[in-house]
């Protein structure tokens, strides 16, 4: 199933239609849909697709390339010789980091190939990579031999929540939020899910060959040689420990420096560091959050229960009992995306320029949307609950109180509540949204 990606596909097709040499880099976490995107762009074009492995790539590549260009059989086993036979062709090399692992000099070889053999041709060279750390350091960095040779870079991100409806047109929005808490916007996981969601999850966990048991190890091996400490940190964050001190206490690492580990997790986009929206990104009030719902789900529910799952005694009810609490955080992400869409359509009281969390001395506001130029602020409370009128009034009063603590005294203030279901949306004090508004 191919969902969304219109902008990426348009950009790729423009490159493929050009009369110039094009060198395009596509990267993003595993399972995100890089290969599908690349192959979709060339489905009606003659091309060479090669998935790099951990050894003997020269031999394997030659075999695949010969199906499109038989004369390559006469080339010696050498990348430079190969590309001499492949001028003006479309060549896709998937998992390019495997070529780098096999031979680090391949970067300089490809630099030479581009500079000497390809730059004045119509060749289209597309390389894909799932190791974000290696693609960043070895391919995209200004220190890379390939720096300055690329004509296009596409970073593939998870699909947005709204696109889940295309995977599950019969699902209600509440069930889509439940699925999103498990699969995020990762196409590979979304394609695995069947409705009803809880029946699927129960069966999947009980499968002896379930992908849930090995998937995160599979993801982490691409980024870390020794993942043990990284796993512990991710588990700590998944259970609500967001400050450096909280993470250290959870792990019992009071005297250890976790900063390098956190920095590495940020680099590969497993986690992100957030600061209150009114503060600098360098603020000491930083908190750490898992970026990917699938990874958060794994470390909250699968990783701590692997033994019980292996023994076949884990009960899905343990997840169900906690899931609404977990979805509180997930729904904040959904609400943020929803408000950004409304903002694009000019359906809010003003056009905001940034949006994020705020916290200070034990007080928190789920989202604040700001336009500092016009001095306008929208304060938002997000509740994964069914809200009656009295609940709305109580939440609004508390949100109004907290808004006075933020320090935006000269700003024009607006208020909003986003809930699972709101009894009545007639409230003159604030904007009210629930899942019905997502349609």
Swiss-Prot record:
Coiled-coil residues: none
Keywords in alphabetical order: ATP-binding, Nucleotide-binding, Plasmid
Record bears the keyword DNA repair: no
Pfam family, one: ATPase_2
Binding of ATP, residues: 28-35
GO MF assignments: ATP binding
Protein name in UniProt: Uncharacterized protein MJECL04
